[in-house]
Amino acid sequence: LPWRNATFCPLECPPNSYYDPCMTGCPATCVDPQAPQNCSKPCVEGCACTSGFLLSGDTCVPEAQCGCLFEDNYYSEGEYSVNENCTRLCRCEANGQMVCSALSCGEDEVCKIHNGQRGCYPASTALCHIYGDPHYNTFDGKLHHFQGSCNYTVVTGCDNSSVGFSVTTRNKHRGSQSWTALNSVALSLEGLHIALRERKAVYVNGALVSLPASPAPGVTISLSGSYVHVSTKLGLQLQFNGDHELLVKVSEKHKGKLCGLCGTYTGSQQDDFMRPDGVVVPDFNDFGASWMVPDDEWPCDPAISPPVSCSPTEEEAANKQCSILTHLGGPFQPCHAVLPPQTYFESCVYDQCATGGSTEQLCNDLGAYAAACAEAGVALGDWSAGTVC
């Protein structure tokens, strides 16, 4: 029974439509202009398209401006479709014609869905951070404290996925059999072997080089602040401080293709502890040891020493020292919303226990969080002011 009128609870209808208190439950659309003729649904109140117009999505358009039915999906005029691997772009043109052309993503782009639309978009990056005793924040954000003192693969391609590079690190004991830290880094790619050693010494294919250097097209090595920075055209960047800290940044185009101590970069932490044989294990020591690389120049004991235990008093002191990372109103608060500090706080407490409350190591751990914040786009300024650093 009609109850609305122009002055009582009027229903505003969009252009090219009108209010109908009992319109068909199967309105004519660009996909099915004959829908009302075979409709068994009861009539409904709503906005019906004016004669000569058809429903395209939620808009009434002239029949001549209807879109395209393509691969069982309807597209309005001007809308486009990209296939699953972004090699074809099809656009709905006038008169219902879908016109397709070849598509290729750029070198710094990846094929993905963004805001509901598949296409070629700028590749994001993921960071793996290695520092301290050592601690590994994987590409997917999982923290582990593998204490091996040998040579290990931190990132390489999984199985048959060729990413074109491999990064290994040598660890060594520092002052205690239960304390190890990163000593040097090696990058292998396209016939190059780049070694980043202590005190920021750099070797390319065995020869010591001065910085900046460009040993191959698309590969640059330079000093940037406190780090030796290696940039490659393969979507890999390294930053090594010449002591204990390494930042490994990879392009999104490598997502799902990586393995090593930096994890799998699949978007899930569940498979980060994957061994070279493809088996995911729960124990990080089993996982870490599986990535050991034979190295005649780096004799080591593959046995993993347990970490030093911390007494309640020592743990309380460590928590107090490291709380500056999580303190609201402290120098690191501006970064909290972008990069939660909890894993860095946990690593800091771990290191304070392992080193007997070393001030130097405390400052190393605070600096590691500051470096990660900088990579995330948060500049903390002189964070060390007012601290023991």
Regions found by a protein language model. Give the residues of each.
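Extracellular/secreted glycoprotein ectodomains characterized by long, lumenal stretches
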Residues: 1-389
